Amino acid sequence: MSENPNPAPAATPSLTLAVTTTGANPLAFDPPSLEAPANTVIQVDYLNDSPVPHNINFFAGADSSAESLGKTTVETGPGATESVIFRTPAAPGDYYFWCDVHGAAMSGMLHVH
């Protein structure tokens, strides 16, 4: 596991979610959307099980122009794993995530409620 470039929040995560990229569909997150409560520290475990380099970057808005909430480093699979810990936004809504390597071609939504 690589060192996360974003420091973790001081709190322990109260929810852990998992996201995978597989060799069968190397330009997609599985699942393509996640759900979490507002203003909650979460951990997202990312498994890159494809041979293509990827990461996952969560944004504080509906697209990549917003500030990053947290991201993993770029990992080359198969079998590379890394976790990112961050606090979800206080406002309910849909928040964008993507792979920094592939941009909008590989993205998803974090539904905060």
Which functions belong to the PLM regions below?
Residues 4-5, 9, 13, 76-113:
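Extracellular/periplasmic metallocenter environments
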Residues 10-41:
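N-terminal edge beta-strand
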Residues 32-52, 82-90, 111-112:
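Beta-strand cores of secreted/periplasmic/IMS beta-sandwich domains, seen most often
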Residues 22, 49-51, 61-62, 102-104:
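Solvent-exposed coil/turn segments that connect beta secondary-structure elements
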